[in-house]
Regions:
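Short beta-strand His + acidic residue motifs that chelate non-heme Fe in jelly-roll/DSBH
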Residues: 52-53, 71-72, 80, 91, ...
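Conserved hydrophobic/aromatic beta-strand scaffold that supports enzyme active sites
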Residues: 40-44, 61, 80, 88-90, ...
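Residue-level recognition of conserved beta-strand positions in structured domain cores
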Residues: 42, 54-56, 73-75, 101, ...
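Conserved short histidine dyad/triad with adjacent acidic residue
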Residues: 24-25, 29, 41-56, 93
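Ligand-binding loop in jelly-roll beta-barrel domains
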Residues: 84-85, 93-119
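A short, N-terminal "cap"/entry segment at the start of jelly-roll beta-barrel domains
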Residues: 1-37, 123-126
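Short, charged/polar surface micro-motifs in flexible loops or helix N-caps
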Residues: 32-36, 45-49, 66-70, 119
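A short beta-strand-loop-beta hairpin characteristic of the jelly-roll/cupin
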Residues: 54-85
């Protein structure tokens, strides 16, 4: 494993696990960095909502780069919070959630980091 690895935009992995309403691009992965235990990627979401999903036993940290989202979570997605550029969100393992882009015109972008070696997405039937 190299001590420092640079991942350029054109090197990101785009065929990662996906959820409707979201586009995930993997950057820090075993395939690109020969690392173990960490996945980091860029996510963009057009106006609208993602499908319901969770990330298994992985913890997730999200940093909003651009835009504003509402995240729904809870047993019946009854709880929500709003986050905007500059905010961080922590998502505990196995937490079912939905991200909603609050803009009607612009995509939202955020960085996601997980203690996993893949994007680890479990889509949930709605």
């Amino acid at each position: 494993m190299e001590n420092i690895v640079l991942i350029k935009p054109h090197e990101r992995i785009t065929n990662t696990a996906q959820t409707s309403g979201m586009i995930r691009q993997a950057a820090v992965t075993p395939e690109l960095c020969n690392n173990n235990g960490l996945w980091v990627g860029l996510v963009s979401a057009p106006p609208g909502s993602s499908g319901a999903h969770h990330h298994g036993d992985a913890e997730s940290a999200i940093y909003i780069i651009r835009g504003k989202i509402r995240m729904y979570f809870g047993d019946n997605l009854e709880t929500s919070l709003e986050a905007e550029a500059g905010d961080f969100i922590y998502v505990a393992p196995n937490t079912i959630h939905v991200e909603e882009n609050l803009s009607s015109e612009e995509p939202v972008e955020f960085i996601v980091a997980r203690n996993a070696t893949s994007s680890l997405v479990v889509n949930v039937s709605e």
